[in-house]
Amino acid sequence: MAAQGFLLIATFLLVLMVLARPLGSGLARLINDIPLPGTTGVERVLFSALGVSDREMNWKQYLSAILGLNILGLAVLFFMLLGQHYLPLNPQQLPGLSWDLALNTAVSFVTNTNWQSYSGETTLSYFSQMAGLTVQNFLSAASGIAVIFALIRAFTRQSMNTLGNAWVDLLRITLWVLTPVALLIALFFIQQGALQNFLPYQAVTTIEGAQQLLPMGPVASQEAIKMLGTNGGGFFNANSSHPFENPTVLTNFVQMLAIFLIPTALCFAFGEVAGDRRQGRMLLWAMSVIFVICVGVVMWAEVQGNPHLLALGADSSINMEGKESRFGVLVSSLFAVVTTAASCGAVIAMHDSFTALGGMVPMWLMQIGEVVFGGVGSGLYGMMLFVLLAVFIAGLMIGRTPEYLGKKIDVREMKLTALAILVTPTLVLMGAALAMMTDAGRSAMLNPGPHGFSEVLYAVSSAANNNGSAFAGLSANSPFWNCLLALCMFVGRFGVIIPVMAIAGSLVSKKSQPASSGTLPTHGPLFVGLLIGTVLLVGALTFIPALALGPVAEYLS
């Protein structure tokens, strides 16, 4: 079993790196504002038709464009969901959503979280899924990538005050990165058996003679960008464990690759744009080390079996509860770590049914800020915050002003870095405390004791860090939970983007200093270890007390 697990991890990472390397080169061209071959004429026509100016923006203008687009998208999606019953492509005549569920869903998809307090096949029409959720899957992913484009330019430009043009970046990312890759993935899913139609739900007779209503819909097109954009919201309630979304082991492997593809490519792109590919490889090494360790822990925990079933005398040599038999324990464990290391949240197994330690690792990966590969764009700019913190700590130890890529990291950057890093832990801990203090929060818990608290902590961690997966034992479709999680998702997304853009605005105006004998190398194994230690230290100090009350207490009980 151990050999199979290591082979699975190694194969996954090898294929991932092979695919991400050329995509990283294409992204590097876009960061450097070099159009991809053959796209200049199309861009010129589109910019002219849309009235888009390619004039560069400072950080405030760039941020305003990103915020404006997302707030407008939130409003449009909110009213679309409220009035769903008036719109076309609703063969099941599904009613509009309640205001609190519509708000939660709109915020969820605009912030790239895709938390779902509803069942897709019984709640949303085809129009809402396509024109509402799928559109936001593209736009939220493009927004995250645009932010990291701006931050990378801030590190590599000198003595400037502009970071590019947000509208140009968003258009190029959507047209030349997300759309073509998502199209290829969608066609592969269709070939493998995923649904793509507009038929009414089909009544069929099962082999047992019973009647069953099978949901239909344009699944493959949404599934592709759901994974590629690290969105994660399923067309169906069962998400990627549903055979209409994820029909074969091949589609399952491609889905995992799609989740990590752009985050990995962005690391390669960062190294190219910085003029030192070792910088990108350093980030990949740090992410990969944490990732492999976490996968190993989850696999080990799940193959030990369920101790509660063993105590009852039941056969539980491995923990298959809540897992698809066609995927098994090892693949389910790998997928769980992939989807929570990235801010995806798609699932092929019920995380609520994992063992105490097996469920704690995905929760902790979210709590450290989704920086182990992370979401498209958001994972890398989150990790860059820890890079700045690690450089600052190293500077304190050797008594020098911290530098990164030749740019001095001053008090302003460190204050903004600390603010950005503290946003999501504050939301998680305060949100979980509020839920446990109120009847409205506690009434949603299916289980008592440590596992019930773990359900609450997981939900708030998932929302604040824009992941979207859940311990499904929490009944979250209530005004209290819909509003609390919507607030966590919105602040968790834009409360980090705002200081990140402010950091970019500060760094882009600085001039790079040549390296000296006292400059800390940021591309070697020493800095990789320092960076990993910084991530672990912040995660440990912040969340160990809360984790001790939940999964650790459950494991020891």
From Swiss-Prot:
InterPro entries: KdpA (IPR004623). Its main location: membrane. It is found in: Cell inner membrane. Coiled coil: none annotated. Signal peptide: none annotated. Keywords: Cell inner membrane, Cell membrane, Ion transport, Membrane, Potassium, Potassium transport, Transmembrane, Transmembrane helix, Transport. It is a multi-pass membrane protein. One of its GO terms (molecular function) is potassium ion binding. The chain crosses the membrane at residues 5-25, 63-83, 132-152, 170-190, 253-273, 283-303, 329-349, 356-376, 379-399, 416-436, 484-504, 526-546. GO terms for cellular component: plasma membrane. Part of the high-affinity ATP-driven potassium transport (or Kdp) system, which catalyzes the hydrolysis of ATP coupled with the electrogenic transport of potassium into the cytoplasm. This subunit binds the periplasmic potassium ions and delivers the ions to the membrane domain of KdpB through an intramembrane tunnel. Belongs to the KdpA family. The system is composed of three essential subunits: KdpA, KdpB and KdpC. NCBIfam families: kdpA. This is Potassium-transporting ATPase potassium-binding subunit.
